[in-house]
C-alpha cells in the first residue's frame, strides 16, 4: 500500500487523506543530459575566462609556459586539435603557395660585388688587394722611386680597407646566422603545436636574409666609396700632375729642337729616350704630342727656347769635332751633353729663319758650318733616321717622302689633334 502511494506521488496523483510532501517543485523531473548534483562544478569555462587566459600568456614565466605546453602535449584531445588545424591550413595555404616566387638578385648588389672583386677587396685570397694595387700601378705607368713609394702607401691603405671590410662582413654573417638559427629553432618548436612545413621554414629564412641584405649592401657601398676615394687620391689620372725631372726635360727638349723639321721620334728613339729620362715610352709619346701642339700654337713664345737649344746643340757638336759622323741616331747617355743627329746641317737654321722671321747673320751660320766641318752634313745625310719636312709659317709640318720604317701619323698642314697619336 505504501509502495502504491509513492508511485502515485511520483506521477502527481494525490490520495485523499495523504498530502503530497515537498510541494510542486518535487514533481519537476531532472534533465537527462544534466549531470547529477553531486558531481561538482561544471566542466565548461566561460569564454571570457578563456580570453583572459590568452591575454595573460605573455606575463607567464618560462616555468609556467613549459608546464602548460607539457599539459597540452599530453592532453588526449591534442591529436584531434592538430588534425583540425592541418585541415584549416590545407584550405587556406594554397593561395600562399601560389604567391611564392623567387626574387632575382639585386643588380646593385651584383655591381658592388663585381667592383669589390675587381679592386681586390673581395675574393678568397687575402693578398688580392696587393695584386690589384700592383696592376693599377703598372697601368698608371709609374716606375720611378717616388711612384713606388706612393704605390706602397696605396697598397697599405687598400689592405686596411680590405681588413675592415672582411671583419665587418664576418660580423654581419655571424649575426645573420645566429638570428636565422634562432628563428628556425622557434618554428620547429612551434611545429609540434601548429602545422609548419619545412618549405615554410625555408621561406621564412629567405625573408630574413632579404632583410639582412640591406645591411650587407650598405657595408659594400661604403667600402666601394672608400676604395674610389683612395684611387682618386693615388692612382687616378686626374690626380695632381707631377712634372718630369729637369734632366729629363732637357733631354726631351734638346731632341725636339734638334729634330724640329721632323719631331716624330721612331719607336727605337722613344725607347732610348725613355731609358735616359727614367720614364715610360707612353710618357715620351705623350710629351712629344703635347709639345708639338704647344709649339704650333705658340711659335713666337718658343722662339727663344728654340734658339737656345739650337746654339747649344751646335756648340756641343763643334766641341766633339768630326766624331759626330759616327754618333748613333738616338740619344747617348743620361749624363752626356745630349748630342743628337740633326736632320741636315741646314735644316735647323733654315727652319728657325722661316719660322721666326729673324735671320741669323751669314757670318754666324758660315762659322758654325765651318766649325762642324764639311763631312758632318754628308755623314748626317747618309744616316738620316727621319725624312725631312717643310716647316710652314703657321707651324704645321708638311711630310715629304715617308719611309716605311718611320712611324708617324698622317696629318694635314694645320693638323693639331692628330699629333697626340704618337
Curated annotation (Swiss-Prot):
Keywords: Activator, DNA-binding, Homeobox, Nucleus, Transcription, Transcription regulation. InterPro entries: HD, Homeobox_CS, Homeodomain-like_sf, KN_HD, PBX_PBC_dom, TALE_homeobox. Residues 31-43 have a biased composition (Basic and acidic residues). It comes from Xenopus tropicalis (Western clawed frog). Residues 49-128 are annotated as: PBC-A. It comes from the Eukaryota. GO terms for biological process: animal organ development; positive regulation of transcription by RNA polymerase II. The gene is pbx2. The keyword Hydrolase does not apply. This is Pre-B-cell leukemia transcription factor 2. Residues 237-299 bind DNA. One of its GO terms (molecular function) is chromatin binding.
